[in-house]
């Protein structure tokens, strides 16, 4: 379940809280380093093959956090192929905090020099880009803030707010009524429960 708490703080501050922040929602401001994008191969969107675009975001304190901006097809993989997705200056994004991905048993190793990234591991990207002040304990999945879908296609977060107490109450109320019905039917059939007609 996603925690619908919106933070106006840096990921570094959240990480420093010492809490379990996986899937925590936050807001970030900074500058995208579009020239240092990497592309996660083998990603799909509605059955279409493509990539996930991971862009470093430089924050006001010069620290860097990696942002998984979402899906693009091969035709729009490189920044030059989608100038409409490039930003100028400081921007603000919404996202959710994610732990570094674990490499699957049959997933190949990342090959940075060849541009083949299969698993999102912030520490490997940081070494490849020679970043010094970078967050490697987490990365952020950017989420959509509009119904209009644009490239890269960011994650869609749906939160179903349920009244668990009401559900439980209705469930047990139904069970109780059923048991009462069974009780009455049993005793009537056994002749233990009858109704006398008024004279």
Question: What role is predicted for each listed range?
Answer:
Residues 3-17, 21-199:
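Surface-exposed, charge/polar-rich loops and edge strands
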């Amino acid at each position: 379940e996603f925690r619908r708490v919106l933070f106006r703080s840096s990921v570094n501050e959240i990480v420093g809280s010492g809490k379990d922040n996986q899937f925590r929602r936050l807001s970030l401001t900074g500058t995208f380093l579009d020239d240092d994008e990497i592309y996660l191969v083998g990603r799909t969107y509605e059955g279409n093959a493509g990539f996930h675009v991971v862009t470093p975001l430089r924050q006001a304190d010069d620290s860097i956090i990696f942002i998984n901006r979402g899906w693009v097809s091969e035709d729009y993989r490189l920044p030059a192929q989608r100038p409409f997705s490039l930003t100028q200056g400081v921007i603000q994004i919404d996202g959710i905090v994610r732990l570094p991905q674990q490499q699957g048993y049959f997933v190949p190793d990342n090959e940075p020099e060849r541009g083949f990234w299969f698993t999102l591991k912030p520490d490997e990207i940081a070494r490849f880009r020679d970043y010094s002040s970078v967050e490697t304990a987490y990365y952020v999945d950017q989420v959509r803030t509009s119904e209009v879908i644009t490239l890269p296609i960011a994650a869609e977060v749906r939160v179903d707010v349920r009244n668990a107490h009401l559900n439980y109450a209705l469930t047990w109320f139904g069970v109780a009524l059923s048991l009462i019905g069974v009780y009455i039917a049993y005793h009537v059939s056994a002749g233990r429960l009858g109704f006398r007609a008024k004279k």
